[in-house]
Amino acid sequence: MAAEFRPRLRLLATSRRRWCHDVRVAQSEDPEDFIAPAAHRVRPGTLLLANTDLLEPTFRRTVIYIVEHNAGGTLGVILNRPSETAVYNVLPQWAKLTTKPKTMFIGGPVKRDSALCLATLRVGMQADGVPGLRHVQGRIVMVDLDAEPDNLAPMLEGVRIFAGYSGWTIGQLDGEIERDDWIVLSALPSDVLIEPRVDLWGRVLRRQPLPTSLLATHPIDVSRN
């Protein structure tokens, strides 16, 4: 499922700077927060939802946000796999900016000893030309964990840090989609920083048209049916 890919990641053991801003997630009035465009192909900013028949524990009922998709392969992070490890214990300088529950999320099975950070820009902010930020889609950006935090804090609603990632080589993901392992859908900015108590998998499906939305009624534990 996951394959070797070489993104720009931050090794967890190399963090040194201190974070000194406590930025809370703000109320947004951006229209794109509520309307996701139709997704017909994989590209940065799309979601991969595990289909109901994908029962492999690593990816069952996962929602993967695609960060990179190019000639080198595809990279994404699982949005709904929180760990019990506090960000403060791993990257303390980012703890105050991290949205609740302020824990590391498991981005996937590849390179679990490295970290990747996504953030949501405040409404009206642009990432173009800002050192330390790389635009992904809409208000979602990738954050360089080696950047100067003081310069980025005023622009960001919040961040989420992922240990590891999910990756595919050229053509590998296409094959998995063809055999219906994944459903390709568009993301809303709120999906990236969603609280773990929310069933993101079901939430994304429920906002789709019929018949896709009916998949949200699929039981979590099919053995109980």
Regions found by a protein language model. Give the residues of each.
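Extreme N-terminal basic, low-complexity initiation segments
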Residues: A2-R10
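A short aromatic-anchored loop/beta-hairpin motif
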Residues: L9-L12, R16-N225
